[in-house]
Amino acid sequence: MPLFGKSQKSPVELVKSLKEAINALEAGDRKVEKAQEDVSKNLVSIKNMLYGSSDAEPPADYVVAQLSQELYNSNLLLLLIQNLHRIDFEGKKHVALIFNNVLRRQIGTRSPTVEYICTKPEILFTLMAGYEDAHPEIALNSGTMLRECARYEALAKIMLHSDEFFKFFRYVEVSTFDIASDAFSTFKELLTRHKLLCAEFLDANYDKFFSQHYQRLLNSENYVTRRQSLKLLGELLLDRHNFTVMTRYISEPENLKLMMNMLKEKSRNIQFEAFHVFKVFVANPNKPKPILDILLRNQTKLVDFLTNFHTDRSEDEQFNDEKAYLIKQIKELKPLPEA
């Protein structure tokens, strides 16, 4: 009895057939419709081989192993991603399902697909370029695959330390809301998933990240961008792994001035997120003189402002405790003794 049944192709045959169909689709000759149909059929067959189907047994481990190996040997993962814009709507979803399935595959403690992608970083860079304006129809599928990749520290490290990462500052501000939001989800995942890796990255790239790029997001004309960026900034500064970065950020007078201005924004949501960053400046027991001087100059105004700040949040115990603490700290501020 044939191992894969008469009508079912083996992993080797499936991968070969899909690669030929993708190449035909890429060539764009007169047989495009046929190539599109072949790509779709083969993607469904590979998806079913990985996930099983309603009328078939779950796939055996050795079948999945053979299929994965063929995907590596044929360089098909990169080829699929490079041609994602040419594949039909359902096919794009199947590519993401196939990619994420083989990515999660483990042999003991090893993740063979992660190891493979480490040797082919172009896969990651091509996925990141999925947020570019040229092909908006692939952005969300690219994002799904990128966030799955970001779960693995080795892959997140390649992405963070690439020039391509800094393009996210542009992607999160694109005019299409769904794409900008998806890009921000991936951006946030890369900056928060692996704490030590992220802390080292932010520390090593502090000026480029905060002064050259992040400041622009905080001053964006787009409300959603400003709010999301402000919220993420609060999370980054309050994460204990980012202590060095936080200390540096709250020592810079321009950052304090920006947060004080954002406390007075029209949007209550932005005011609230700004409060969570502002409190870090005030709570710092070792305030540099320029920071202390700004707080002292505005001492009375700040006490009055905070006393009347979001008074309707009466049931938010943590917020009210923090607000009371800040008011007390600001009231008790004194100039540094003369040297």
From Swiss-Prot:
One of its GO terms (molecular function) is protein serine/threonine kinase activator activity. GO terms for cellular component: cytoplasm; nucleus. InterPro entries: ARM-like (IPR011989), ARM-type_fold (IPR016024), Mo25 (IPR013878). Gene3D superfamilies: Leucine-rich Repeat Variant (1.25.10.10). This is Protein Mo25. GO terms for biological process: intracellular signal transduction; positive regulation of TORC1 signaling. Belongs to the Mo25 family. Disulfide bonds: none annotated.
